[in-house]
């Protein structure tokens, strides 16, 4: 990785890049398989866009610079994206949103305590619009919002909601005042286009306590 020529330290950048590539999987957790003890029980889930992502270019640059000095350094890992918990071990932390598809339920946990618990309706399984599984980052929140997209028959839809909190592509949490009930098996044939439909009062409550970047764990 390093050599000395004419009293000058020469760093093999390609060797450094290979070293960083090997360490990438250790320090990056996006899409990882996680076994977590959550409000709804112990679950295993993989996929999603949440987690730590090492900035390889920046890491190579800082490592080369450190090696060129010929001195000992305590280098920090350079991250392009960070999670809410520690980088290794539990990168979720103790504040998160949990969605159980099988139980049709959402829990909001803050500092290890359940602060919101509600039945919901998720994506329509029969029409292939099931809510995606994985660990995601809450993108943002806005109120009100107009949700637009296509139905399975190609027709367009435009729905106004009071509270919109997306976590992946067009999927997110929102109020669904048109539904008379939540939970149960409704999602199997009469679910959403992929979103997590919530009772209006619960969507209002959730909107007031969530933050962008918060982990969202969707499992079976």
Regions found by a protein language model. Give the residues of each.
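Active-site scaffold segments
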Residues: 162-209, 214-218
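Surface-exposed, secretory/extracytoplasmic low-complexity segments enriched in Ser/Thr/Asn/Gly/Pro
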Residues: 1-159, 163, 210-212, 217-220
């Amino acid at each position: 990785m390093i050599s000395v020529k004419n009293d000058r330290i020469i760093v093999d950048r390609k060797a450094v890049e290979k070293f960083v590539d090997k360490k990438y999987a250790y320090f990056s957790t996006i899409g990882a398989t996680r076994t977590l003890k959550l409000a709804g029980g112990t679950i295993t889930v993989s996929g999603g866009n949440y987690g730590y992502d090492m900035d390889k270019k920046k890491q190579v640059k800082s490592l080369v610079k450190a090696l060129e000095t010929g001195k000992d350094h305590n280098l920090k890992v350079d991250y392009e994206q960070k999670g809410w918990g520690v980088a290794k071990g539990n990168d979720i932390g103790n504040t998160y949103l949990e969605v159980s598809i099988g139980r049709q339920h959402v829990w909001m946990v803050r500092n290890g305590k359940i602060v919101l618990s509600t039945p919901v309706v998720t994506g329509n399984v029969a029409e292939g619009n099931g809510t995606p599984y994985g660990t995601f980052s809450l993108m943002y929140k806005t109120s009100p919002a107009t949700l637009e997209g296509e139905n399975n028959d190609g027709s367009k839809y435009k729905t106004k909601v009071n509270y919109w909190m997306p976590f992946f592509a067009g999927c997110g949490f929102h109020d669904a005042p048109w539904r008379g009930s939540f939970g149960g098996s409704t999602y199997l044939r009469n679910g959403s286009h992929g979103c997590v439909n919530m009772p209006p009062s619960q969507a209002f409550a959730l909107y007031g306590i969530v933050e962008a970047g918060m982990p969202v764990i969707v499992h079976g």
